[in-house]
């Protein structure tokens, strides 16, 4: 028999429900359902027990149209996400409903979004490098397969573009499965991402649909269901216009889908999965909104007192087990570019590699605007990467650090006061800085340049040639937005020829 209650109070997304008639309270984190007058189902999540018969819940949808006295049904379980091969290539919201205009996937399997982290004995500790084809990342802050990676940056420095390039590169290089959780970001970016994935073949809607899309149409009747099951990605969205409840839970919905692919279904081996979260700060921000609405005392800078607990509960689920792995890339918005803010600082503690995007580097026109001295990785050591890679990375860091120290002298006294050796360091460091830039596949329509994936061997060779002084004769501009060092040499020699009057 259903456990039925009634709404007693509505304050924005917070709804109080009384179960006085049934006398049975739903468990904490249970999903409750209310049906509006127009037939739409609103899902609530039980957060607090207020007394003998009352609970306080947070809504996963907007609450317009709800009134006191409406019937509320306890589902008896947490919010469920459909899983299985049928969710490949599909778009879902926080409660696992398809939002791509196609029918709900035919899968009997569902998993609760609140699940325990894997047991200690099941966790895998093997270390393997995940090469991305992006020079600055692969050389100085390499990613760990099955690790957690953070992309830190303020507004408008290129976090989402970098994430889209990583999805594109890794899907093509490793033919991996990706789950993308859009947490509190722009709806337009979600739309762009879906189109980008269809164009690149990461999501496969079939040839007929692709042709209609190229002609400017969006005819979902032309989607090939067989082709859809061969897609390499699943998308889950809770955008910035949605309720704080949805934004606080959508990352867990995406993670649940990734966990299913990682663990397998019991009959077959699990997979290596990529989980992209854009933006993990919005998860914290939504948690802060919910916490305040629930009446909890705020802690530092107004964040929720349970910030570290909520972050830890989610991050501990993102791990590699003996059956498969989840490698997560998380974009982290840094409020006012302050890395000591509690939200990014709490995220730092869980990461294996950090890629810091800098406004100062973006202002130089160097994209991706990765700060090579602020970014780090726990596997930057010779045992994992080998001596040649490690030594090259150290040489690059040393020359950039020395250049940074000399910048104050240059600003006050000018280049004339530097020693001959320091002048060489400055010019080589500037070439190194520019060689970190690279044209992206996903930015081809903005830059007009063909996207490049660069192997680690080509990257090491290029930076060694610059630091050894083999390319001192080439202009600095030759190293800007190129892939391999051969392209830089070709571009530089062409520039020199054009500069010499015939």
From Swiss-Prot:
GO terms for molecular function: ATP binding; ATP hydrolysis activity; proton-transporting ATP synthase activity, rotational mechanism. It catalyses: ATP + H2O + 4 H(+)(in) = ADP + phosphate + 5 H(+)(out). Keywords: ATP synthesis, ATP-binding, Cell membrane, CF(1), Hydrogen ion transport, Ion transport, Membrane, Nucleotide-binding, Translocase, Transport. Disulfide bonds: none annotated. One of its GO terms (cellular component) is plasma membrane. It is found in: Cell membrane. Its EC number is 7.1.2.2. InterPro entries: AAA+_ATPase, ATP-synt_VA_C, ATP_synth_F1_bsu, ATPase_a/bsu_AS, ATPase_alpha/beta_chains, ATPase_F1/V1/A1_a/bsu_N, ATPase_F1/V1/A1_a/bsu_N_sf, ATPase_F1/V1/A1_a/bsu_nucl-bd. Transmembrane segments: none annotated. Produces ATP from ADP in the presence of a proton gradient across the membrane. The catalytic sites are hosted primarily by the beta subunits. This is ATP synthase subunit beta. It comes from Amoebophilus asiaticus (strain 5a2). The gene is atpD.
């Amino acid at each position: 028999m259903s456990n039925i209650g009634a709404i007693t109070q509505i304050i924005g997304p917070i709804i109080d429900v009384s179960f006085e008639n049934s006398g049975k309270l739903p468990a904490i984190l249970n999903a409750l359902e209310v049906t509006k007058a127009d037939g739409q189902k609103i899902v609530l999540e039980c957060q607090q027990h207020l007394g003998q018969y009352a609970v306080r819940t947070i809504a996963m949808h907007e609450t317009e149209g709800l009134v006191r006295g409406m019937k509320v049904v306890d589902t008896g379980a947490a919010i469920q996400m459909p899983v299985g091969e049928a969710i490949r290539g599909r778009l879902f919201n926080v409660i696992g409903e398809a939002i791509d205009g196609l029918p709900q996937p035919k899968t009997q399997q569902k998993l609760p979004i609140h699940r325990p982290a894997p047991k200690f004995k099941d966790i895998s500790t093997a270390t393997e490098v995940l090469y991305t084809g992006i020079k600055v990342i692969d050389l100085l802050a390499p990613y760990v397969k099955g690790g957690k990676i953070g992309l830190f940056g303020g507004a408008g420095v290129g976090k989402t573009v970098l994430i889209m390039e990583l999805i594109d590169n890794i899907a093509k290089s490793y033919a991996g499965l990706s789950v993308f959780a859009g947490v509190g970001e722009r709806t337009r970016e979600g739309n762009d991402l879906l189109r980008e994935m269809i164009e690149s073949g990461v999501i496969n809607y079939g040839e007929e649909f692709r042709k209609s899309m190229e002609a400017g149409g969006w005819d979902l009747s032309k989607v090939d269901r067989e082709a859809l099951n061969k897609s390499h990605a699943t998308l889950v969205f809770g955008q910035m216009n949605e309720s704080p409840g949805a934004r606080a839970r959508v990352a867990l919905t995406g993670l649940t889908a990734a966990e299913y692919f990682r663990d397998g279904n019991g009959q077959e081996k699990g997979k290596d999965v990529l989980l992209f979260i854009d933006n993990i700060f919005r998860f914290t921000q939504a948690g802060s909104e919910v916490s305040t609405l629930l009446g909890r005392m705020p802690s530092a800078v107004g964040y929720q007192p349970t910030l570290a607990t909520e972050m830890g509960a989610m991050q501990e689920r993102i791990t590699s087990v003996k059956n498969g792995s989840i490698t997560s890339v998380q974009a982290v918005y840094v409020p006012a570019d302050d890395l000591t803010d509690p939200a990014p600082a709490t995220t730092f503690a869980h990461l294996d590699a950090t890629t810091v995007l800098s406004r100062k580097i973006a202002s130089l026109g160097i994209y991706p605007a990765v700060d090579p001295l602020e970014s780090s990785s726990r596997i930057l050591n010779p045992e994992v990467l080998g001596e040649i890679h490690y030594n090259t990375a150290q040489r690059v860091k040393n020359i950039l650090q020395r250049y940074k120290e000399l910048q104050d002298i240059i600003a006050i006294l000018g280049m004339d006061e530097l020693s001959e050796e320091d002048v060489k360091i400055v010019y080589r460091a500037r070439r190194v800085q520019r060689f970190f830039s690279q044209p992206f596949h996903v930015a081809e329509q903005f830059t007009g340049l063909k996207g490049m994936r660069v192997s680690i061997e080509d990257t090491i060779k290029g930076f060694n040639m610059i630091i050894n002084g083999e390319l001192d004769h080439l202009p600095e501009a030759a190293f800007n937005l190129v892939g391999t060092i051969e392209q830089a040499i070709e571009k530089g020699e062409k520039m020199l020829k054009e500069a010499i009057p015939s």
